[in-house]
Every structure is written in C-alpha cells, then in structure tokens.
Amino acid sequence: MPDSSSHAFDFTTFLADKEAWSAPNELVPYRCRDDSSLGCRHYPAAGMSGGRSHLILLHGSSADSRYLASLATRLAEAGHHVHTPDLRGHGPAPQRRGDIDHLLQLEEDLEDLILSLELPTDARVIVAGHSAGGGLALRFSAAVCQRKRADISLHGVILLGPYLHHLAPNMRRDSRWAQPRIARMLACALLNRLGIHRLDHIEVLGFNIPPEYRDAHTTDAYSWRLMTGLNPRDYQGDLKALAHHQLPVLALIGEHDEAFHAERLAQCLQPHHPAAQVEVLETIDHLGLATSSITAERITAWLTKQRTDQGGTPG
C-alpha cells in the first residue's frame, strides 16, 4: 500500500527494494537526425539465437532508464531484446535538462533509435512505456501508424500504468506528483494556437521528488515543449488509430497505483480500442509496477500469445 508521507508515490518501499534490482547495462550512443547523440541501454535476448521481439521500453517523468533494468533483464532472459533509451532532456548529461527543441522531437528520436538498430525484416518491434513513458508509447505508436512509414513496422503496444490526460477518468485528482504552473501553461497554449512558440522553452511542470531519490540524473521540471511532446495528443484518437491498424495493446496497472484509479483504466481504453487487454495486478503500486517480476511474467505471456495467434513461433 502507498505510504503516508507527503510524496505522491511510495518511494520508501521503492528505494528499500533497490539493492535487489538488476544493474543497468551501459548507455550506448545513437545518432539522431539533428546530428546530436542520445543514449540507450540494450539488453540482448538470452539464448544462442535470441528472439525476434524487440521492445522499446520508455521511462517515466523525471527519471531515466536505470530503474527499468530489472524489468528489461527479466524480459531479455525470457527471450526478448529490450532497448531502454534515456529520453532527450533526461539522463546523466542532457544538452538541456527538461527541454527539447520542438514538440515532435521525442517522436523523431524514437524513430531514429529504431532505425539505428538495423533490425532484420522479420523483427517484431513493440513499443512499451511506464507512466508518462506509456503516454509517449501510445502517442508514438499512433503517429507511426498514421504516417504509414514503410521503414518502421510495429507489432504491439504495452502501457504500464500509463498517463493519458489530466482529465482522463482514471486520473486521481489528489495526486501530488506533478506540480503544474497553470498561468504559464495557459499562456503557452494560447500562444501555440496563434502559431507562436517563443515561450515553449519555459518551465511549466515540476515534480515532487524526495531528496533521497534525487541524484545527478534527476530531471525535476519540464518545459512546455517537453511536457507537450511527451503526452498523448489525443489518447482516444490515438487508441482508435491503433485499433484501425489492428495493433494489439496490453495495459497493466497496479491495484494500489497512487496516480491513477486502477479500476477505471479499462473504461479509458476499451471504448476506443475494444481488443485492448487490460489487467490490474494485485498488491502492486505505481513504482512497483516497473520492477515487479509479475509485470515481466504478464508481458511475456502476452507476447507469446500474440505471436502464436498470428501464426508464428514464440519469440
């Protein structure tokens, strides 16, 4: 259960379990279209030949890819390649912490990452994300479907306690994680409607991060363009796009999620993507979802079923 501290999430349990986490693999640079370099951790599938599934696993707000190491390692041990990038504006040494250059840059970076992997034609790319990373996974996957890119083919989307919208039915109104600067947000939104982006760099969102969880990698605030580029444009429309292109969706959420009402996630997703599989995992909270062995087990079972249903062999 969540602790009773002033923080939004149960960091006490999360940090107490940290010693049991898998060590993260090293960041490996990849080149982006603007000639900048970003980092990604790669977890190769276990076995001599490895599987054909490649999961792009995205971290949540304020964090970087390190806390996903245990989940990535378990999935790799189950025969899936996993790639966990540090999103632009995050990680150990971003060019500008908490900021990006323009609203679509995170999507472009993910396209560049997938292309940099130089995957074989029979590779199965699945985009997954935790929390705000889940929102970006949804946004990016829908954009790829709508653009009909011939060089990027997706085979599924996995949402782990995803952020959808601040007015989505599953959003807890009393969550203390995000600290919006409403006046700045309204000003930027109005200017953007007028085609003006001169203030897109200003900070509009802070995070309630306990001191013991902060380190040199922590990103404690977002600019307007990073916040806007990370969140789904229109989560209902994005889900409809995935359904239209018959892209399968798995959504997992912890029973004790402190940010979202777990029992309401299905009603957010299934009216727009009726085939979306939604599961509530007992005894798990928001942060624990990203480190629990049960999460890896449910993802692995779903990937195996998807592959079998489509007439292939697991992997």
Predicted regions and their residues:
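Conserved alpha/beta-hydrolase
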Residues: 75-95
